Structure formats: structure tokens, C-alpha cells
């Protein structure tokens, strides 16, 4: 613990070169200068530690984070998200050190993912501790309906009797991801689900029957893309 505190103090010595707002945000985010991968945080570490089965990206990406004090950390920082630990990681461009953000100090954040971007928010309607980050898939937290996703990643036990592993000599940890979706609605409250059919969606939102019938043409489980389209159309997005 003392070593982490010392590292945090050393990092803070570099803060004056930033603007006052960014310096305060940077200070708020720092809780440790260690990481589950490697403190030197080269871009290959995420690949070696589970890749996109565990992290949002296999290397650092651009983005921004909004602190509890409504200050934005953006310029000069790289970001990634760990689905196993539900943690946001940052790296200051001119310092090869990974920083673990304090979930209590972060309100929301966005990380660029190819041509798209992943938006993460908190929802006290789902998580009373208000510490867990959910991916905002569709709609808006201030709109009629929001579609949130909680993705979790778990390490799988290594099978030393696996022939393929024995031949390759690769005993690295493998991960499995699972997702739970949530509709957060001002009228119905919160509805969590792993899968949903058209009939279930019609029962949940009978007032939006016209939109559902137009978008959902199969009685099978609705795919994520269609769930997002439904949520956005209800919100007029």
C-alpha cells in the first residue's frame, strides 16, 4: 500500500505541467500505479493478458473521461476498459505507466473503438452502489428509454491435459464473456435480460407496437443491433 501511495505522489509531481482542471482530474483518477498486466503498459500487454475477450481494446485507444467534479480528462491520455474487473485504465502519453481509475471518481467515459465509440455510464437504478460501469448501447440516460449492457469476463481454468495446449506449450489464461442487457425506462423501471423475443418486447412495451413490428420481423431472439435500433427510434434518435 505504501509503495502505491509513493508512486501516486511521484506521479502527482508531474501534474503542474497540465492545466488546472486536467491536473485535478488526473489527481482524482489515480488510485494505483500498478496494473493486472504490466506497469510499463506497452500495447502488447492487453493482447497477452486476454485481448478483447477481457478488454474493450487489444491496445490503447483515444477517448475521454468525465470526473466526479465535472472535469474532462482527454488530451494527452490513452484509455482502455477491463471487463473482468470493471475498471477504467488510463495512460499519460509521455509517461509509460498504467493508471487504474477510481470508479468513485469517474462519472462516465467514452473510448474510441474503430470507427465507432463505446460509451460507459453508471446507473443507480440498476446498481445501488453507483460504482459499476454499464455500456450505453442505445437511447439516452436522460431520454425515454436507455439500453445498457453489463459485460463480464471470467478467466477459464487451464486444462493441463489439453492436447493442443501441450503441443503448443501455450498455457495462457483464456477468458469467456457474458452479457446482461437492461432497459431503463421512466415508466416501467428496470428490466434485465440476457435474451428477448419479439413477443416479450411487445409485452414489455405495448405502447411501441408499431416500432417493434416494423423492426423485428422474426419471432426468434432479437439481436443486439435491432435492440439498439428500437431504443434509438423510441427516443427519436
Question: Which residue stretches match the model-derived regions?
Answer:
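Long, compositionally biased interface segments
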Residues: 193-237
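Generic detector of short, well-ordered, non-transmembrane alpha-helical segments enriched
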Residues: 15-17, 73, 226
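Bacterial Sec-dependent N-terminal signal peptides
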Residues: 1-26, 230
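Detector for intrinsically disordered, low-structure N-terminal pre-sequences
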Residues: 8, 14, 29-30, 105, ...
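Solvent-exposed, well-ordered amphipathic alpha-helical segments
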Residues: 62-63, 92-93, 234
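Aromatic-patch recognition
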Residues: 66-192
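General N-terminal leader/first-domain-start detector
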Residues: 2-3, 20-76
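Short amphipathic alpha-helical segments, especially helix-boundary/capping motifs
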Residues: 37-39, 186-190, 204-208
Amino acid at each position: 500500500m505504501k509503495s502505491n501511495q509513493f508512486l501516486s505522489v511521484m506521479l502527482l509531481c508531474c501534474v503542474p505541467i497540465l492545466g488546472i482542471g486536467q491536473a485535478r482530474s488526473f489527481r482524482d483518477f489515480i488510485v494505483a500505479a500498478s496494473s493486472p498486466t504490466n506497469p510499463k503498459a506497452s500495447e502488447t500487454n492487453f493482447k497477452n493478458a486476454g485481448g478483447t475477450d477481457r478488454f474493450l481494446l487489444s491496445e490503447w485507444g483515444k477517448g475521454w473521461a468525465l470526473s466526479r467534479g465535472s472535469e474532462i480528462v482527454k488530451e494527452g491520455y490513452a484509455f482502455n476498459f477491463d471487463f473482468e474487473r470493471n475498471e477504467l485504465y488510463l495512460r499519460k502519453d509521455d509517461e509509460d505507466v498504467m493508471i487504474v481509475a477510481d470508479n468513485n471518481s469517474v462519472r462516465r467515459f467514452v473510448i474510441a473503438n474503430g470507427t465507432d465509440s463505446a460509451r460507459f455510464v453508471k446507473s443507480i437504478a440498476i446498481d445501488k452502489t453507483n460504482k459499476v460501469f454499464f455500456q450505453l448501447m442505445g437511447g439516452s440516460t436522460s431520454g425515454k428509454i436507455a439500453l445498457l449492457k453489463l459485460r463480464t469476463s471470467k478467466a477459464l481454468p487451464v486444462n493441463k491435459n489439453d492436447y493442443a495446449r501441450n503441443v503448443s506449450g501455450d498455457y495462457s489464461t483464456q477468458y469467456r464473456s457474458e452479457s446482461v442487457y437492461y432497459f431503463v425506462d421512466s415508466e416501467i423501471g428496470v428490466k434485465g435480460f440476457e435474451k428477448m423475443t419479439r413477443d416479450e418486447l411487445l409485452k414489455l412495451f405495448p405502447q411501441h407496437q408499431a416500432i417493434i413490428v416494423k423492426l423485428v420481423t422474426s419471432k426468434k431472439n432479437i439481436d443486439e443491433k435491432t435492440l439498439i435500433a428500437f431504443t434509438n427510434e423510441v427516443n427519436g434518435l
